[in-house]
Structures are given as C-alpha cells and as structure tokens.
C-alpha cells in the first residue's frame, strides 16, 4: 500500500537549505513526494516563492508550482508572476512557462512566454515573444537576458524598440 503522512498548519519541511511552508501537506513516503496545499511558500537564501499548491519531488530537488498566481521575489524585490513555475532547490533555478511577467525594482515590466531565473547569478532569461515596458520605451524581441544585479538587459535578434514621451 501507499504510505501517506499528513502534516497540518503550518507544515514545515527543510531540504537543500530550503524551507517549504504551507497550511497542509501530504507526504507520500513511498515516492518521496510532498503535495503542499494552501499558502505555499518556499524560502531559499533571500528568494521567496509563493503559490496555491505545489508538488515537491524530494529525490529530484524539484518543486512544481501550479495555480492562478505563482510569484517569485528575489532579495532586490524583482517580482516574477506566472501560473506555471518549476524550481530546482539544489541549483536555485526557476523555469516558467505558458506566460510570465516580471516587474523590476524600478517599475520596468518584462513579459514573455517562457523563461528562467538563476538565483545564484541573479540572471533572468526571457524566451519567445518578449516585451519590455518602461515609462517611455517599449521593446519587443525574441529573447532577452536581464541581469538583476546590474540592471542590464541584453536582447536577442529581431529586436524592435519604440520611444514615446507619453507612454
């Protein structure tokens, strides 16, 4: 049979120097998977991920967030929002897909269909249909890397930019 352990509020787990906190968790001891439900939070170093629910595959170091809003906030208050985000707790790398939006500490907004965030290097990579909005500039590109430490953006090929003082 399957051996489950139920942990209720607030449930706390520690793995790879990462805390998993939630209201309720079901731990499948046989497969070493944790199903976290309601007010789910992952805390690693100074990166915080929040969402409605996740499945944590302990042996693969992988947290799969799914829900209406999944949010990643780094120590510099750059905020990435999506509905689908996978986070590797060993490598400290997030992968988002099916659309995402990042707002940096200065208010710039970057959107794309998919991308990654490496919390060790503070590098966001945006892939496919990338749009960047500032108070006066709009940039559209196929890919973009954004270094959160230096606030430097590097665009891929097929990049177009517009400037308007009234944006």
What are these regions (language model features)?
Residues 1-167:
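Structural signature for solvent-exposed beta-strand/loop edge elements and short helix-capping sites
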